[in-house]
Amino acid sequence: MSYSVGQVAGFAGVTVRTLHHYDDIGLLVPSERSHAGHRRYSDADLDRLQQILFYRELGFPLDEVAALLDDPAADPRAHLRRQHELLSARIGKLQKMAAAVEQAMEARSMGINLTPEEKFEVFGDFDPDQYEEEVRERWGNTDAYRQSKEKTASYTKEDWQRIQDEADELTRRFVALMDAGEPADSEGAMDAAEDHRQGIARNHYDCGYEMHTCLGEMYVSDERFTRNIDAAKPGLAAYMRDAILANAVRHTP
């Protein structure tokens, strides 16, 4: 069975112009031509196109794709194994980037407009500017992002120091509660969680209980947050998450 260039373009999600270009450069030459001279693609041609698109998705230039596919020592299974390895590596990298984007958003919501050195001092080895473009792309349309940018635009270094001092005091309160053996759903722990929520709302953006619990989950799901928080006391991130959740339940009708 053979397929027209329009059919193949529809199958593959590419343009007819792209297929013409692949033919012109010898990357994907149709196996057949109709009596009228129109391109006709076989199933084998579609297999090759699939390989081309895999490699293109992985960022390979067309000349390298051609060299890989025309290598007489490689068979289709070898290409699939290679592509699987490359795609798995890319997935891992994207997962790490997604986690970094979430942390960058939280960093921005906390108003980090200091020097790079000061940012590192507050957040350890994470630099929010590294993923600024991804932060804007993913979160730029959210109310929280806009509120935080507007509210913090005029903050001075003294304002940031005050906010950091408040955060440090809250950390000491949580640590003291843990040291005293107070459970995360105790009045003291829930009160500390409520002060944490109100601090975010006061200094950055409207932070309801649902959003607050999402932040609490991030403290344990993102290892960089966990590492930064647990530096004060091992297990603190999970304790804060549990206290935040208990406080949200307390205030939910």
Swiss-Prot record:
GO molecular function terms noted in the UniProt entry: DNA binding; DNA-binding transcription factor activity
UniProt cross-references to SMART domains, sorted A to Z: HTH_MERR
Domain of life: Bacteria
Alphabetical keyword list: Activator, DNA-binding, Transcription, Transcription regulation
Keyword Hydrolase found: no
InterPro entries: DNA-bd_dom_put_sf, MerR-type_HTH_dom, MerR_fam, TipA-like_antibiotic-bd, TipAS_dom
DNA-binding region: 5-24
The keyword DNA-binding is annotated on this UniProt entry: yes
Domain annotation HTH merR-type: ranges: 1-71
PANTHER family in UniProt: HTH-TYPE TRANSCRIPTIONAL ACTIVATOR MTA (PTHR30204:SF90), REDOX-CYCLING DRUG-SENSING TRANSCRIPTIONAL ACTIVATOR SOXR (PTHR30204)
Function: Transcriptional activator. Is activated when bound to the antibiotic thiostrepton.
The protein's assembly and partners: Homodimer.
Name of the featured protein: HTH-type transcriptional activator TipA
Taxonomic source organism: Streptomyces lividans
